[in-house]
Regions:
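Short intrinsically disordered, low-complexity coil segments enriched in acidic
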Residues: 1-2, 226
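Feature captures the catalytic cores and cofactor-binding loops of soluble hydro-lyases/lyases
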Residues: 202-281, 287
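Short hotspots in intrinsically disordered terminal tails
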Residues: 6-7, 284
């Protein structure tokens, strides 16, 4: 690899302009010691980023859409292109945001093109996109809602919510031996454990528990419990499967919260140490 490529400099067009920050302010409900507290909190920002690649004589082509925290987008794009084998460091000539004037302010910061000196080494799943480019969190949420399974509203007791992480942990032998796997579990609204699966990938663990019900043609329990944080794609899986509540020991992202609220899903994070924070559906949590 040509190490000089890292020091010669690459054109980064528009990255100094104002863009979404890494966190957003939100109103949440904290449950602690039998009390409810409405307060403001900070949530990590999550937005889709469309990655494109262009080279002389060809229009830019979309190669991926990834979820990320805004900031250092050009670094993300350049690193991703090299790591995926699409190009080498020496062939990256410029990185820029989409500048279509018809786009909203947030949309134009969610599309990045990496201009290469010549054709890419490979182009996985490449396809042309329209000139009216743009991708934003609102559109992403609406796309998921269009595929959502109908679900009945779920009501949970505070005591049940507080007990769920421990009930999940009881069925995590892999974590007990290694500390290196995630877990997902499906539970009834009264806290009855139905199925728990582990995997090195939290997304895979969710696929496994949902798949276990699909393959046995059994009813889908309404509550999904996660051992880590809640990203957009995990809420997407829950909504598409018709689940009514997500409970996690970690924090959610901004786009995950938006989708949960739009879909009418109860979302609980930081469920540990005798407390938790409700980001969506707090009105369906009873004492």
């Amino acid at each position: 690899m040509d190490r000089s490529a890292y020091s010669r400099g690459v054109s980064t067009i528009g990255e100094r302009r104002r863009r979404p920050g890494p966190t957003v302010r939100d109103r949440v409900t904290e449950f602690r010691d039998g009390a409810r507290l409405e307060r403001e909190d900070r949530v990590i920002t999550e937005e889709p980023l469309e990655l494109r690649v262009g080279w002389p004589g060809r229009p830019a082509e979309r190669v991926a859409v990834t979820m990320r925290t805004p900031g250092h987008d050009f670094e993300l794009a350049a690193g991703w292109m090299v790591h995926e084998g699409i190009t080498t460091p020496r062939d990256v000539r410029a990185v820029r945001y989409c500048t279509d004037e018809t786009l909203g302010e947030l949309e134009e910061f969610n599309v990045v093109t990496v201009d290469l000196a010549g054709p890419p080494l490979t182009l996985p799943a490449a396809r042309l996109v329209s000139s009216a480019c743009g991708v934003c969190g609102t559109d992403t949420v609406q796309d998921v809602l269009a595929r959502a399974e109908a679900t009945d509203p779920v009501t949970l007791s505070v005591a049940t919510v507080l007990a769920l992480p421990d009930r999940l942990r009881e069925q995590q032998p892999g974590f007990g031996r290694t500390g290196g796997v995630h877990a997902a579990g499906l539970f009834e609204a009264d806290g009855t454990r139905v199925v728990v699966r582990e995997d090195v990938g939290r997304h895979n663990a969710v696929d496994k528990v949902v798949g276990s019900r699909i393959l046995t043609a059994q009813r889908m329990p309404p509550v999904l419990v996660l051992s880590g944080r809640i990203g957009f794609e995990l809420v997407q899986k829950a909504v598409v499967s018709g689940l009514g509540a997500l409970v996690a020991v970690g924090a959610p992202t901004s786009l995950a919260v938006s989708l949960a609220r739009e879909a009418g899903v109860v979302m609980v994070g930081f469920d540990r140490g005798g407390r938790f924070v409700a980001y969506a559906g707090a009105e369906r949590l009873r004492d």
